[in-house]
């Protein structure tokens, strides 16, 4: 029932993309490292926006880059998410998907809030959630030991179960996305470090909600269908890998002119991008060359300028 033609096709695609990313990391790791910061920025911003957590753009960027201290409740949530994502990216091999790990990550998610909500199950006694989460983690780990079972099928199922268990009063949805990153990285699918999966989830939130609802129907009775959410998540990963593939091709291309590289950076970037972010992605291109390329793109109406001064950003005009 789970192995529909669409899902089988997506699995094949993702296995191929995984191999390509691994090969590029072996040959062009330095070039690819330039886009990790941008992906992290997009991930933290998108995941928190999905939960209605709003922070002014200038403050958001400083918070994500750890260049200011959080002040409001929303800023503290952003800072907590930033730190947990950073920890997962750096230490995923040492973070098994166990209840103790999940509780620790949830505690860290709220470490700036000064509240006891972090690291505690939602019900007073804690037992029902604790038992359900322990059973889920044990079943997942056992399934991973079976070489016949593809982690890309197990991970969406884990997410559906986790979201239906809903072990926390606050932060369950954000934790689910952090756990998605953790499980993907541990399974060798590191695309989220170079292309923001959360940004794609945000842009397709209606489809996300619909797929999750369909796969959650009759969950308590144990007769739910995991296929809708599995197909959705695999499609999301394919989109992320395609975006990464385009960026990697551009970064490792030898024949493109510098203005064309600036153009492609903006075109392939999801959302707004600043001049400083462009410069970080292309350290061999001078600031003057980037400024000239931006002016030319503006004159030809390929991009739109947003804001001014230090916080000026640019976005690609979709019709071009």
What are these regions (language model features)?
Residues 1-320:
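FIC/Doc superfamily catalytic core
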């Amino acid at each position: 029932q789970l192995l529909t033609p669409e899902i089988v096709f997506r699995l094949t695609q993702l296995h191929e993309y995984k191999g390509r990313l691994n090969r590029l990391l072996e040959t062009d790791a330095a070039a690819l490292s330039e886009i990790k910061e941008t992906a992290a920025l997009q991930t933290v911003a998108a995941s928190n926006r999905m939960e209605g957590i709003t922070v002014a753009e200038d403050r958001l960027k400083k918070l994500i880059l750890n260049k200011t201290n959080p002040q409001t409740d929303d800023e503290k949530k952003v800072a907590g998410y930033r730190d947990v994502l950073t920890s997962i990216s750096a230490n995923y091999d040492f973070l098994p998907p166990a209840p103790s790990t999940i509780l620790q990550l949830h505690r860290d998610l709220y470490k700036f809030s000064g509240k006891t909500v972090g690291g505690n199950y939602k019900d007073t006694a804690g037992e029902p959630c604790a038992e359900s989460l322990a059973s889920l983690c044990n079943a997942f780990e056992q399934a991973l030991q079976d070489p016949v079972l593809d982690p890309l099928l197990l991970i969406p199922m884990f997410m559906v179960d986790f979201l239906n268990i809903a072990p926390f009063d606050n932060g369950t949805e954000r934790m689910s996305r952090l756990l998605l990153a953790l499980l993907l990285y541990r399974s060798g699918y590191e695309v989220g470090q170079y292309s923001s999966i959360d940004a794609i989830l945000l842009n397709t939130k209606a489809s996300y909600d619909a797929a999750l609802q369909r796969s959650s129907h009759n969950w308590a009775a144990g007769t739910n269908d995991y296929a809708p959410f599995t197909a959705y998540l695999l499609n999301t990963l394919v989109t992320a890998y395609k975006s990464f593939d385009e960026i990697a091709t551009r970064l490792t291309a030898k024949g493109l002119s510098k203005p064309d590289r600036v153009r492609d950076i903006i075109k392939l970037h999801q959302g707004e991008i600043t001049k400083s972010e462009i410069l970080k992605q292309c350290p061999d291109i001078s600031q003057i060359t980037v400024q000239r390329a931006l002016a030319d793109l503006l004159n030809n109406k390929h991009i739109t300028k947003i804001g001014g001064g230090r916080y000026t950003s640019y976005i690609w005009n979709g019709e071009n």
